[in-house]
């Protein structure tokens, strides 16, 4: 129930006093105040109109109560901490005092034991006999007389006291010791207080306490073992009334007769309950037994060491020689089995290392040179033979891993990563591989069983060689890694971790590789790699391609290549495809620049008209202003649809895919790829200012894309230039002749620069200017026709490897394009100064002064720096691929 404004003011006025009173009364009052406070808060937070003074009063009261509660909580926490500290200190002092007392007592005990005289030898035997005869601690002086037997021991006095009798001269010492022992354990005191000094009654009560049944008692004669020689009734049917417990009564439980029993059997005497002693007498006997056990416990009981030695030391006759021999034989057999297991494990490790080497050999990397000329000749012969075989097999195959690159843009090509076979074929290969592995495991088990059945006399092989071999492999791998870092490698991009690739070993045959023409996956970005939810690296884009007609052996399938689109000089043609830009609010969009081509006119005709004159371009552009461009907006990466754009200008077919979506099969007949423009004089609409003037890059974002004469809003603001997809021509590159083609190398000898799919984004400042960071450029540099890997004839650990000579680092064509395009500001070339022949340092000083005067670097410096960046990026990419390949094969 909500309160009114007057009630709220009254409650706020007394809130602090009520809170303090509730704290003083107890928890129940605090709960009541909390309930009232909740109602007050709900009333204030409701829609009830309140005066500003009321709201101000509520704020002041709430802040005051909050501060007070915080102070009380802090004080309670401090009190709790102080209480805990005091209790911990008291407990620590108590433990310390106990430890000190225990230490002092142990020291005093040790001193007391050291000062004690030695125990006579006969006391041990007498004490043991006393503990076993507490029901009658009166030994006889004659060997034939024995005390009453007890359930604990049935031995007589003669054998038990024989050591004591042998060590003492008279019986007086034993009698005096037994008299003192009976006094110490309280036998005499119990006899005087409980039984009035009557030893016979004391012995009878002790028999009831520690003795046996009545039948055994009738057969014994207590008078023979008693020192007092008093006449004792040999047979007692009942216990005197003063020995019985006043709380217990003798009761008989009559057994019910059964039907098959005879009448004579039914009238049998019921069993008699055992007699009971008075509780005080039983307690006195129990205390006496305890004192008897504690009398010489600290002197005569064996220590823990004696118990351990006695338990572990077995007599020799108890050991069975046959069992000992069997145990020794089993231990030897287990040792041999362990040695064989270690041998098989070392063999498996060597096989795994060899498998990794073979898998690593399937990817191109620089071959280490050798000082031995014979080995170089053998390697060259094997390389040439393999290249010829590879070229023949590639010509016969329908689909090849090579791509068709146009002559002007061969330097922009990059190695692609594609699926090696169809999904169905890969599934069958996986089944076959699993079956082969199971067969290998079965054969390995059979071999291990045969090895275990061999003679036990054969010593296990030494495993030191395997360790030395592993060290040699490690040294060889380190040397190979050093050589790889010294020279720039060729390499192919591996598929994503989710690609169903199965690596199968072959005895003397290099694994074959097939490329599916209808399924292509772009390479993953360099490290660090961001993985998607399904395990596929972000940036992997499935794309549609068209299978080229296999008219000749040199026909190749079209490939999607990714690079930075930069304005190239007139000697090179401009990419005839779309670009991808990023901006707000759409993270990834596909901007189809082909929309600038008017309807009813082909791209070639339009570019011819554009190249002829500038006014014609403006007219053609304005004539097609009514045609709207198609923009694909997806929440993630959009497929490179510019490759699949048809001849129609107003349509742009796009396929929206997720960045983490795995590649799927696409029929080759679904799209049609338009051949690029081969003329070098044509200008792409991307670099046409008239086309750029039709777009408003500064307008706010909306849902549609508009293009017209006026400045209309666009659906994005192109602030970053990302990548460009280029559909290269079907003509092969000049570097890919049949004599140098190889399956192990998917890049031409003059390799292409590569840019990261994610991180090579440059800022677009104008339609003709863009800037890129130095760390965003990567490249694949070539090392000549011997860049491919050939099968090693000898293991790397046994070959003499010498470091390869450093080759001069030459920048790729991308560096020249960047410098010649004007995107990078460099200083002009300095006119060389003629220096006197005598002064060799004059030219250097003049060059340094000239370089200090100019804030920009020379083109040679920029070119050298970019070449170094490309080389370093290629090395890092090679190391990343090597680590990814090792992780994929389980190494």
From Swiss-Prot:
Positions of region (Disordered): 331-592, 606-671, 779-812, 836-861
InterPro entries the record matches: Mating-type_A-alpha/beta_1_N
GO CC, one annotated term: nucleus
Keywords assigned: DNA-binding, Homeobox, Nucleus, Transcription, Transcription regulation
Comp. bias intervals (Polar residues): 651-660
Bias (Acidic residues) ranges: 369-400, 427-457
Localization annotation: Nucleus
Main location: nucleus
UniProt feature, compositional bias: Basic and acidic residues: 331-360, 841-850
Chaperone recorded as keyword: no
DNA-binding region: 111-189
Function: Specifies A-alpha-3 mating-type. May regulate the expression of genes specific to the homokaryotic cell type.
Protein name (Swiss-Prot/TrEMBL): Mating-type protein A-alpha Z3
Organism: Schizophyllum commune (Split gill fungus)
């Amino acid at each position: 129930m909500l309160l009114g404004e007057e009630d709220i003011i009254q409650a706020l006025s007394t809130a602090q006093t009520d809170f303090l009173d509730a704290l003083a009364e107890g928890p129940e009052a605090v709960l009541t105040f909390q309930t009232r406070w909740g109602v007050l808060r709900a009333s204030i937070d409701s829609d009830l109109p309140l005066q500003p003074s009321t709201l101000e009063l509520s704020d002041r009261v709430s802040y005051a109560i909050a501060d007070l509660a915080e102070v009380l909580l802090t004080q309670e926490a401090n009190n709790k901490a102080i209480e805990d500290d005091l209790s911990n200190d008291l407990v620590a002092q108590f433990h310390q005092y106990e430890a000190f007392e225990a230490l002092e007592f142990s020291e005093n005990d040790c001193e007391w034991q050291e000062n004690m005289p030695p125990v006579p030898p006969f006391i041990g035997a007498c004490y043991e006999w006393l503990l076993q005869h507490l029901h009658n601690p009166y030994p006889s002086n004659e060997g034939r007389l024995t005390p009453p037997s007890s359930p604990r021991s049935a031995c007589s006095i003669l054998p038990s006291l024989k050591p004591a009798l042998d060590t003492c001269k008279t019986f007086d010492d034993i009698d005096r010791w037994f008299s003192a022992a009976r006094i110490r354990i309280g036998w005499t005191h119990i006899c005087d207080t409980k039984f009035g000094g009557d030893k016979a009654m004391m012995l009878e009560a002790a028999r009831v306490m520690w003795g046996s049944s009545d039948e055994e008692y009738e057969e014994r004669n207590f008078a023979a073992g008693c020192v007092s020689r008093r006449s004792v009734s040999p047979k007692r049917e009942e216990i005197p009334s003063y020995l019985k417990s006043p709380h217990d009564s003798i009761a008989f439980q009559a057994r019910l007769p059964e039907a098959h029993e005879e009448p004579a059997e039914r009238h049998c005497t019921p069993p008699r309950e055992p007699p009971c002693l008075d509780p005080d007498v039983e307690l006195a006997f129990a205390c006496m037994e305890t004192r008897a056990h504690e009398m010489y416990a600290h002197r005569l009981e064996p220590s823990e060491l004696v118990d351990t030695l006695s338990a572990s030391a077995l007599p020799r006759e108890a050991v069975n020689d046959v069992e000992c021999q069997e145990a020794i034989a089993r231990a030897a057999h287990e040792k041999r089995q362990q040695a064989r297991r270690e041998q098989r494990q070392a063999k498996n490790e060597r096989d795994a290392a060899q498998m990794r080497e073979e898998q690593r050999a399937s990817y191109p990397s620089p071959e280490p040179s050798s000082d031995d000329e014979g080995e170089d000749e053998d390697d060259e012969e094997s390389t040439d033979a393999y290249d010829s075989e590879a070229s023949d097999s590639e010509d016969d195959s329908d689909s090849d891993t090579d791509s068709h690159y146009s002559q002007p843009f061969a330097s922009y090509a990059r190695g692609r990563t594609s699926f090696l076979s169809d999904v169905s074929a890969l599934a069958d290969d996986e089944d076959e591989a699993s079956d082969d592995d199971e067969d290998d495991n079965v054969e390995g088990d059979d071999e291990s069983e045969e090895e275990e059945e061999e003679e036990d006399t054969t010593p296990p092989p030494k495993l030191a060689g395997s360790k030395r071999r592993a060290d040699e492999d490690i040294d060889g791998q380190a040397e190979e890694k050093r050589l790889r870092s010294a020279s720039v490698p060729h390499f192919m991009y591996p598929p994503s971790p989710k690609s169903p690739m199965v690596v199968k070993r072959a005895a003397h045959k290099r694994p074959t590789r097939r490329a599916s023409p209808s399924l292509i996956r772009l390479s993953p970005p360099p490290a660090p790699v961001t993985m998607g939810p399904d395990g596929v690296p972000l940036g992997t884009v499935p794309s549609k391609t068209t299978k080229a007609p296999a008219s000749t052996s040199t026909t190749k399938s079209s490939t999607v290549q990714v690079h930075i689109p930069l304005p190239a000089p007139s000697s090179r043609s401009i990419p005839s495809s779309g670009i991808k830009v990023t901006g707000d609010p759409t993270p990834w969009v596909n901007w189809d620049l082909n929309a600038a081509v008017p309807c009813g006119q082909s791209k070639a005709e339009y570019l011819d008209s554009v190249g002829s004159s500038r006014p014609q371009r403006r007219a053609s552009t304005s004539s097609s202003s009514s045609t709207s461009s198609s923009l694909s907006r997806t929440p993630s990466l959009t497929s490179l649809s510019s490759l699949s754009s048809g001849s129609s200008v107003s349509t742009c077919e796009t396929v929206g895919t997720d960045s983490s979506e795995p590649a799927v099969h696409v029929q080759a007949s679904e799209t049609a790829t338009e051949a690029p423009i081969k003329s070098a004089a044509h200008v792409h609409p991307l670099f046409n200012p008239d086309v750029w003037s039709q777009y408003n890059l500064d307008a706010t974002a909306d849902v549609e894309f508009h293009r017209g004469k006026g400045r209309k809003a666009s659906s994005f603001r192109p602030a970053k230039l990302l990548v460009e997809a280029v559909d290269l021509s079907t003509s092969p590159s000049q570097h890919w002749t049949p004599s140098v083609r190889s399956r192990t190398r998917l890049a031409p000898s003059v390799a292409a620069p590569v840019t990261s799919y994610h991180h090579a984004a440059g800022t677009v400042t104008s339609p003709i200017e863009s800037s890129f960071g130095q760390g965003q450029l990567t490249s694949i540099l070539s090392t000549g026709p011997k860049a491919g890997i050939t099968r090693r004839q000898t293991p790397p650990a046994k070959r003499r490897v010498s470091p390869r000579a450093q080759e001069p680092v030459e920048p790729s064509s991308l560096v020249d394009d960047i410098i010649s395009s004007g995107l990078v500001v460099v200083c002009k070339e300095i006119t060389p100064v003629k220096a006197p022949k005598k002064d060799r340092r004059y030219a250097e000083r003049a060059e340094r002064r000239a370089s200090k005067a100019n804030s920009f670097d020379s083109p040679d410096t920029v070119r050298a720096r970019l070449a170094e960046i490309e080389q370093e990026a290629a090395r890092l990419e090679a190391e990343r691929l090597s680590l990814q390949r090792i992780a994929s094969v389980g190494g």
